[in-house]
Amino acid sequence: MKTRVGVLYGGKSPEHQVSLSTARAVMNAIDPHKFDVIPIYITPEGQWIKGKRLTGTVEEVKQLQFTSTATAMIPVSLNQVPASGSATESDEETIDVIFPLLHGPNGEDGTVQGLLEMLNLPYVGNGVLASAVGMDKVVMKNLFAQAGLRQAKYVSVTKYEWKKGGEAVYDRIEQELGYPCFVKPANAGSSVGISKCKQRDDLKTAFAEAFKYDRKIIIEESIVGREIEIGVIGNDEPICSVAGEIVPKKEFYDYEAKYEDGQTELIIPANVTEEQYETIKSMAIAAFKALDLSGLARVDFFLAEDGTVYINEVNTMPGFTPYSMFPLLWQHSGVPYSELIERLIALALERHQEKQMITYTFEK
């Protein structure tokens, strides 16, 4: 009997379109002999719409953008959830595991993961806490520091502090970090809202842009060097892929460079020494464990001109688009795309089975 996979995508997020591209790629790559795919679309307004079981190739992402005339779902309806933990009423439509392909807020940040936990449904990827920490760059970097992982200097600022502090906030950035520096929303991915600043006027513009996407931002010193990324999969015994290098044709790796074909060169495997690769692997595994990750992650690094390795961030649900680094890293590590998806589903079921052994009641 085939495993029924509910592919969850879209979402109320600035990265809605990225999610659609990722979902299309995964749906077309998943092995139809082993899995039945049930699309579940979350509109930009937050409505959940369940499509019919996939029977062919998804040619264009617009095929995945269901309208309100399709079957609407109520995300939480406990009377629809049998003891087995399935997501729908009839056995014919039972979903065995959810593959959340949601990027950014309201999807990659632990919110949907919490819902799936409440429904007792297996799901691919990281849990509630790990997803939330992986989305919040400030909390993430605080944990990196606690774990002793080398990283660029950074400062965090809330919108309230910015409005109240005025020019003093910019003074602090210049004193602690200097120029150039990068300004990012704390809770956004895919380089949404990121700016490179070379002077105070840039900083003012960058703050206004980043605060469109979050109430908290992070400012980081610029590390001159190369951008190296590595894939990690697993639960209690995570393993790493080969390393890859990002060579953006623009000044830095922004949204367009990530998702527009021809904007970025990916070098796989990266031209690093064996010692550097071992350091990158070791730091990636340490970060994976420090943040209590499970399933998968892409860990990003800077390799400075002097050979020093700095951890940048983790991505708890890396993209699976045709131009995405994560699946390409695993393909070059001997794990084809469809097999990678199959492994991630197996890891999700393994973790869920382990959770079923936990006792949630207490009697004296």
Curated annotation (Swiss-Prot):
Principal location listed in the UniProt entry: cytoplasm
Q: Where in the cell is it found?
A: Cytoplasm
Molecular function as annotated in GO: ATP binding; D-alanine-D-alanine ligase activity; metal ion binding
Q: In which pathway does it act?
A: Cell wall biogenesis; peptidoglycan biosynthesis
- Name a biological process GO annotation: regulation of cell shape
In the record's cofactor note, how is the cofactor described as bound?
A: Binds 2 magnesium or manganese ions per subunit.
Keywords attached to this entry: ATP-binding, Cell shape, Cell wall biogenesis/degradation, Cytoplasm, Ligase, Magnesium, Manganese, Metal-binding, Nucleotide-binding, Peptidoglycan synthesis
Domain (ATP-grasp): residue spans on this chain: 141-346
List the HAMAP family hit by this protein, alphabetically.
Dala_Dala_lig (MF_00047)
Its function?
Answer: Cell wall formation.
Question: NCBIfam families from the entry?
Answer: D_ala_D_alaTIGR, PRK01372.1, PRK01966.1-2, PRK01966.1-4
In which family does this protein belong, per the annotation? Answer: Belongs to the D-alanine--D-alanine ligase family.
What is this protein identified as? D-alanine--D-alanine ligase
List the gene name: ddl
